[in-house]
Amino acid sequence: EIGSGLVGSEMCIRDSEWSIPAANITDIPQFEYRGLHLDVGRHLYPVSFIKKYIDLMSMQKMNRFHWHLTEDQGWRIEIKKHPKLTEIGSMRKETIINRYSAAIPGIYDGTPYGGFYTQEEIKEIVAYAKERYITIIPEVDLPGHMLAALATYPELGCTGGPYEVGTRWGIYDDVLCAGNENILSLIHISEPTRPEPIS
């Protein structure tokens, strides 16, 4: 792979004055897919952090960035056809801050939390990764882990709600209704990996 080879060569000459000693370097990755995952659905990271993350991936010769963009706790990608996804689905009213169970009630911080990436920011990150020979794989959970979308469009659920953006971790019973054809318009969001605008 060219990208991996360039990273390896750059490491050899980092502290020199751009001369490469005579050498034969054999640097073949053991695995074709060398990826790292980042969950921004539960916790939003700034673009600057994601770029640093991609830089560190490149230094380790990783080639796939698995970007977890949606979750019960937040919808993080701007979809122009569905602006309510970011107006409503990107914000949760608070976040649980303790371990909880049936016997231990949840303790919440009482602080609204959220945000999302604009199409322009996503394109910027995709281009940044591509320059470092890293492919972005956007992830949208289906049919579960979709409370952020259900809070926005309750008619897409099997029960009709009411729903709210998730404030605790774990598994929720509410999911998208697989028989509802309207959910198809939500799942075409892998388009940020293309140069055209996301619709």
Predicted regions and their residues:
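Hydrophobic faces of well-ordered beta-strands that scaffold small-molecule active sites
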Residues: 34-38, 65-67, 136-140
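Contiguous, structured surface segment used for ligand recognition
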Residues: 3-4, 9-31
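Flexible hinge/switch segments at interdomain interfaces of large molecular machines
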Residues: 23-32, 159-167
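Active-site-proximal loop/turn and secondary-structure-junction residues that shape catalytic pockets
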Residues: 42, 69-73, 81, 140-146
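A conserved hydrophobic secondary-structure block that centers on an alpha-helix together
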Residues: 39-72
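Single conserved hydrophobic/aromatic residue that forms the stacking wall/gate
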Residues: 1-8, 12-13, 188-199
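Aromatic- and acidic-residue-enriched carbohydrate-binding clefts of CAZyme catalytic domains
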Residues: 73-131, 148-181
